[in-house]
């Protein structure tokens, strides 16, 4: 028992067939971003944020030149340019964006939290009132790929929530240009303000405000380690959605699942990033070997071969499990961002799942469906955070307020209990604030 060393040509991927080793390996993968460099990155980001806070646009331009290699002047992309981008993209792509927009909007409209009022028997009322934040900033990554889907997934719930002003930031390429499809998605989503800046300096601009960029109440959207660190450091004075780590998928499968489907779905994560993680929990030893073979075939001529190889080699894993119960236990411990269930009794497995950002059931539901147009948000908790949090949604862009109104009768009826509780905490002025209202 223990590890079976597998080395298929240049592809290395761990196969484990016992619970103890599986738990240790999943723990290692989950903590893959806990680097010794984190303190160094914190210091760099703190300096950037402080400069942006002090010098505003000048600091933003400085760091954009330094890290992105272009002068972002002018910083804002005009609304006409956004409209031009929409007009210029392929008609088929335009249709696909519209289909995705419609489905995502329909789902998020169901998420709108409802205000409510409870009336007490003595005339008191208590209310929960929901209101949108005034403005929000959304960060759209550049770099290895363009993500128009991320524009939709961040902008649509903000729009549905009723946010008055949405400011989008995204790093330009060396020529200072943002991908045309990303700009088209911004136009479709009704975004008026787009700035071609990225990195920690963009987060600082949104958090503190500059002459050109208004300070926002909430910042959402994924980014690299510098963006994530900046969001962590400004949290408390500005709201954020989450601290996104590298993408991850966990597939639970049995012998009925097709190995070529599994391999394709694992690679769909691996191609994102060298730190992306692709994990298979299977009840079939033969399937484990077949999936490895399929991975090699598909990676060999993949346009992002090197990224896939690094991801699979360092953060890929196959675990051969005795039964569904072990698959469920290991999955819940790992708490994946994306969970696919490709098994004959997928609904039974689903009943045991407690921790997952999003769950994809059956052979006709590859994770890519959720990435683009199923409707639920694709901004999901990573690094085990689905144990206590969920996806980005309409509530991310809203806040609630409690409204309380007592009359003389309701305060009198409840006064003794309020006084008793206040005095038990030694807060006598609290108690007196009730007593004094009934003194002659």
UniProtKB/Swiss-Prot annotation:
EC numbers for this chain: 1.1.1.23
GO MF, one annotated term: NAD binding
CDD domains named among the record's database cross-references: Histidinol_dh
Required cofactor names: Zn(2+)
Domain of life: Bacteria
Pathway: Amino-acid biosynthesis; L-histidine biosynthesis; L-histidine from 5-phospho-alpha-D-ribose 1-diphosphate: step 9/9
Keyword flag Lipoprotein: no
Cofactor detail note: Binds 1 zinc ion per subunit.
PROSITE patterns (UniProt xref): HISOL_DEHYDROGENASE
Chain positions recorded as substrate binding sites: 247, 269, 272, 338, 371, 425, 430
GO cellular component: cytosol
Catalytic activity: L-histidinol + 2 NAD(+) + H2O = L-histidine + 2 NADH + 3 H(+)
Residue numbers annotated as active site: 337-338
Entry binding sites for Zn(2+): 269, 272, 371, 430
Homology family: Belongs to the histidinol dehydrogenase family.
Free-text function comment from the UniProt entry: Catalyzes the sequential NAD-dependent oxidations of L-histidinol to L-histidinaldehyde and then to L-histidine.
Entry-linked PANTHER family: HISTIDINE BIOSYNTHESIS TRIFUNCTIONAL PROTEIN, HISTIDINOL DEHYDROGENASE HDH
Protein name stated in the entry: Histidinol dehydrogenase
Organism: Prochlorococcus marinus (strain MIT 9312)
């Amino acid at each position: 028992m223990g590890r079976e060393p597998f080395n298929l040509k240049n592809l290395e991927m761990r196969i484990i067939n016992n619970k103890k080793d599986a738990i240790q390996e999943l723990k290692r993968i989950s903590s893959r971003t806990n680097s010794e460099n984190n303190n160094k990155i914190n210091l760099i980001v703190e300096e950037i944020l402080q400069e942006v806070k002090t010098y505003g646009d000048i600091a933003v331009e400085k760091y954009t030149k330094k890290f992105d290699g272009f002068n972002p002047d002018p910083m804002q992309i005009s609304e006409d340019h956004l409209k031009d981008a929409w007009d210029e993209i392929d008609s088929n792509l335009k249709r696909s964006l519209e289909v995705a927009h419609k489905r995502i909007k329909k789902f998020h409209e169901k998420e709108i939290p409802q205000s409510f009022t409870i009336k007490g028997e003595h005339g008191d009322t208590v209310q929960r009132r929901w209101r949108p934040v005034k403005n929000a900033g959304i960060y759209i990554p550049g770099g290895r790929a363009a993500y128009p889907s991320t524009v939709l997934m961040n902008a649509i719930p903000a729009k549905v929530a009723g946010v008055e002003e949405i400011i989008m930031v995204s790093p330009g390429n060396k020529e200072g240009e943002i991908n045309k499809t990303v700009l088209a998605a911004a136009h479709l989503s009704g975004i008026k303000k787009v700035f071609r800046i990225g990195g920690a300096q963009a987060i600082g601009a949104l958090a503190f405000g500059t002459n050109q960029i208004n300070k926002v109440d909430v910042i959402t959207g994924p980014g690299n380690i510098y963006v994530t660190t900046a969001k962590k450091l400004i949290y408390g004075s500005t709201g954020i959605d989450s601290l996104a780590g590298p993408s991850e998928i966990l597939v639970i499968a049995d012998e009925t699942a097709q190995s070529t489907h599994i391999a394709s779905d694992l690679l769909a994560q691996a191609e994102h990033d060298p730190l992306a993680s692709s994990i298979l929990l299977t009840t079939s030893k033969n399937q484990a070997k077949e999936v490895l073979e399929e991975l090699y075939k598909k990676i060999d001529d993949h346009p992002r071969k090197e990224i896939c190889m690094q991801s699979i080699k360092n953060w890929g894993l196959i675990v051969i499990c005795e039964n569904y119960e072990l698959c469920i236990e290991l999955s819940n411990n790992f708490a994946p961002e994306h969970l696919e269930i490709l098994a004959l009794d997928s609904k039974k497995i689903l009943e045991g799942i407690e921790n997952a950002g999003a769950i994809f059931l059956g052979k006709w539901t590859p994770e890519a469906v959720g990435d683009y147009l199923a409707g639920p948000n694709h901004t999901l908790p990573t690094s085990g955070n689905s144990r206590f949090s969920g996806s980005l949604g309409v509530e991310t862009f809203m806040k609630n307020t409690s409204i309380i109104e007592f009359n003389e009768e309701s305060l009198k009826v409840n006064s003794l209990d309020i006084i008793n509780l206040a005095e038990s905490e030694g807060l006598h002025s609290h108690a007196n604030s009730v007593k004094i209202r009934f003194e002659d």
